[in-house]
A protein has these predicted regions:
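Short glycine-rich anion-binding loops that position phosphate/pyrophosphate groups of nucleotides
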Residues: 10-11, 68-71
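Glycine-rich phosphate/diphosphate-binding loop of Rossmann-like nucleotide-binding domains
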Residues: 1-39
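Short beta->alpha junction loops
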Residues: 38-48
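Well-ordered alpha-helical segments embedded in enzymatic catalytic cores
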Residues: 24, 48-52
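Proline/glycine-rich low-complexity loops and linkers
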Residues: 48, 76-134
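An anion/phosphate-binding loop that grips the pyrophosphate of nucleotide cofactors and donors
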Residues: 60
């Protein structure tokens, strides 16, 4: 089975952050018998995300996306994915509760963009992350 990994984030392209996610994913996938055919890095740009998904669909059986989900006002990844897959964002109550618990454990207040982290595509399966960072 052929896999493509798409990494999203301007910070990756300008060298501000080193992409260790795709390297880790590729190794784990390879260890499980999957073949990563391509790793594509793109900016936080609606059209770049759509183009990367369209192109990857022609090459890969499985497409994995990492990045582009930071709690920033300019994040467009989720809305672009919803547009591409013809669905909408909904607030996931379990995810929101987990986010609230995390902030409480760190003694921090949530801001508007943190609430938006609980918004997920209505047709997705949420995979929770127990290893959170402040």
């Amino acid at each position: 089975m052929n896999v493509e990994i798409i990494t999203i984030g301007d910070e990756l392209l300008i060298g501000q952050v080193v992409d260790t996610n795709s390297a880790w994913m590729a190794k784990e996938l390879n260890d499980c018998g999957f073949r990563v055919k391509q790793i594509t890095s793109i900016s936080d740009d609606r059209q770049h995300i759509i183009n990367a998904l369209t192109e990857a669909q022609g090459r890969a059986d499985v497409i994995l996306i990492t990045g582009g989900l930071g709690p920033t006002r300019d994040d467009i990844t989720k809305t672009t994915l919803c547009e591409y897959f013809k669905t909408e964002l909904i607030q996931n109550k379990k995810v929101l509760k987990d986010i609230e618990s995390m902030f409480k454990s760190f003694g921090s207040e949530m801001i508007e963009t943190n609430w938006q982290q609980a918004d997920v595509p209505s047709n997705c399966k949420v995979i929770t992350n127990s290893k959170v960072t402040p």
